């Protein structure tokens, strides 16, 4: 019994001394920072060009209107025409006459913002920044006529587009 008592005391002292001999390891202090974004939001406002005529709409490089994207926390936007004939054309949006099915004119999108890239693909235009950051909160996009707009009549023209946004 006495041997067991000494054995227990010896084991206890040995455990305590090995713990007290342990050296402290390295310590690190690190600042953790993050950015909390506003909820993603997207709106678009169309402003057609005044005083369009058959002669200036029928030629290329005529400004027909400006679509201004107002957004928060958006990285890229895809603008696609819902016109079936535009799905095979790179970045084209066709405006069709409201009552005359054979009258239409094609446009493409452009911008004056040097920090914006427009990737014109079959059926859509991808709008993104050159450095991968978020789009500016207000981004005007110009709709410019293309070549081959020959069968025009006076009246109202419309184009339907789908705007899809991407967030990270």
From Swiss-Prot:
Coiled coil: none annotated. It is found in: Fimbrium. Residues 1-22 form the signal peptide. The keyword Hydrolase does not apply. GO terms for cellular component: pilus. Keywords: Fimbrium, Signal. A longer minor form, starting at amino acid 15, has been detected by amino acid sequencing. This is probably due to alternative processing of the signal peptide. Transmembrane segments: none annotated. It comes from the Bacteria. Fimbriae (also called pili), polar filaments radiating from the surface of the bacterium to a length of 0.5-1.5 micrometers and numbering 100-300 per cell, enable bacteria to colonize the epithelium of specific host organs. This is CS3 fimbrial subunit A. It comes from Escherichia coli.
